[in-house]
Amino acid sequence: VDAVVIATPDHWHAAIAIAACKAGKDVYLEKPLTFTVYEGQRLIEAVRANHIVFQTGSMQRSMSVFRHAAEVCRSGKLGKIKFIRAWAGDGPKPFTLETSAAPAGLDWERWVGPLPAEWLNKYNHTLNPLLDEKGKDECWGAWRWYQGLGGGFTTDWGAHMFAIAQ
């Protein structure tokens, strides 16, 4: 194995990416890279110390319509750009869901992974990584909208919008 693609739930990103770097593997990491500045600094250190090829996954930044818009802005056709505003919706909401036992077949402890131990007792069917908000098996995780598990729209869509604004 020469490289890894990391497209796990957000709270796993930093731990897996840093471990991959330390193992000498090149890394493609989906957004958001990390939850905290501290995690980001540790990731940068791991990439540099191990001479890793590292790429951030941000599909919108690579889309032709956004690349064209950036080229127009950089070309000077619009004059000197003095200000850019990017908005991506609300941040995460507090976890106030009623908790229950995780269903058979879902290794909740493994899914929680690097999160604080309190999350081991916070399962709710809404968080099931195999179910969407309507209970369909479409692997769309509502977990991303709750503090501690995801960053709400800020990290889910903000990562795209802020990258494009750059």
Question: Can you say where each PLM-predicted feature lies in the sequence?
Answer:
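Predominantly a Rossmann-like dinucleotide-binding segment in NAD(P)-dependent oxidoreductases
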Residues: 52-56, 60-166
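N-terminal Rossmann-like NAD(P) cofactor-binding module of classical short-chain dehydrogenase/reductase
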Residues: 2-5
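Beta-strand-loop-alpha-helix segment that lines the small-molecule cofactor/substrate pocket
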Residues: 9-10, 14-62, 76
